[in-house]
Curated annotation (Swiss-Prot):
The lineage of its organism: Eukaryota, Metazoa, Chordata, Craniata, Vertebrata. This is Protein orai-2. InterPro entries: CRAC_channel, Orai_sf. It comes from Homo sapiens (Human). Oligomerizes in homomeric and heteromeric ORAI complexes. Native CRAC channels most likely consist of hexameric ORAI heteromers, implying that diverse ORAI1, ORAI2 and ORAI3 subunit combinations with distinct biophysical properties can operate in a cell-type specific way. Interacts with STIM1; this regulates channel activity. Interacts with CRACR2A/EFCAB4B. The chain crosses the membrane at residues 66-83, 94-114, 148-168, 196-216. GO terms for cellular component: membrane; plasma membrane. It catalyses: Ca(2+)(in) = Ca(2+)(out).
């Protein structure tokens, strides 16, 4: 660090000298203070990089677990659902259920693919107890893909999962107490199955709205927190610049 800054350091000097310390003039004290400030800033940058690494690793782990669970549930629901052959389902209902299940599985498998490809490389670096190994991790370059997997798994994937539950309730309950002969389905509210499916939809719609509102609120709170933290860092850098400018003017006077 001293070689890069071209500032000589006396190794016999104390770590935290005072400007009036015996054997060290004001010029040496200013140089030592400058080196300490730059070194502390370098360590803070490394700490920030490691925090980003651990955050990326946590997001990848959460995405992989969530995607594996929800995609597995969707596949089981598709395979295990038993359609009543004697009941004529509405065509839009079957098309919507098939499309929702396919998109749900595709989204979660894509998020799982990203997590599976990137997570081992991040884990390999995070398990090395060396501060300088942070540059070997691909989390900075792969940050857009990590955020994409996180969004697919926790936002879009969960919304599709809620829609999947609603459609599954309609397919499961709609034939209950319905007519067994072929023909158009009975009118709305005429049998128990239709009412049960309607109740599940009425319950799930507020849940979906609450989920969307919470997601937006959480994202805005997170952005506000990051903005405040960056503002504090900018203020600290500004104070450091003012202090260094004052030290340089003092050296010019001397």
């Amino acid at each position: 660090m001293s070689a890069e800054l071209n500032v000589p350091i006396d190794p016999s000097a104390p770590a935290c000298p005072e400007p009036g310390h015996k054997g060290m003039d004001y010029r040496d004290w200013v140089r030592r203070s400058y080196l300490e400030l730059v070194t502390s800033n370098h360590h803070s940058v490394q700490a920030l990089s490691w925090r980003k690494l651990y955050l990326s690793r946590a997001k990848l782990k959460a995405s992989s677990r969530t995607s594996a669970l929800l995609s597995g549930f969707a596949m089981v629901a598709m395979v295990e659902v038993q359609l009543e052959t004697q009941y004529q389902y509405p065509r839009p209902l079957l098309i919507a259920f098939s499309a929702c299940t396919t998109v749900l599985v595709a989204v979660h498998l894509f998020a799982l693919l990203i997590s599976t490809c990137i997570l081992p490389n991040v884990e390999a670096v995070s398990n090395i107890h060396n501060l300088n190994s942070i540059s070997e991790s691909p989390h900075e370059r792969m940050h857009p893909y990590i955020e994409l997997a996180w969004g697919f798994s926790t936002v879009l994937g969960i919304l599709l999962f809620l829609a999947e539950v609603v459609l599954l309730c309609w397919i499961k309950f709609l034939p209950v107490d319905a007519r067994r002969q072929p023909g158009p389905p009975p009118g709305p509210g005429s049998h128990t199955g239709w009412q049960a499916a309607l109740v599940s939809t009425i319950i799930m719609v507020p849940v979906g709205l609450i989920f969307v509102v919470f997601t937006i609120h959480f994202y805005r709170s997170l952005v506000r927190h990051k903005t405040e933290r960056h503002n504090r860092e900018i203020e600290e850098l500004h104070k450091l610049k003012v202090q260094l400018d004052g030290h340089e003017r003092s050296l010019q006077v001397l």
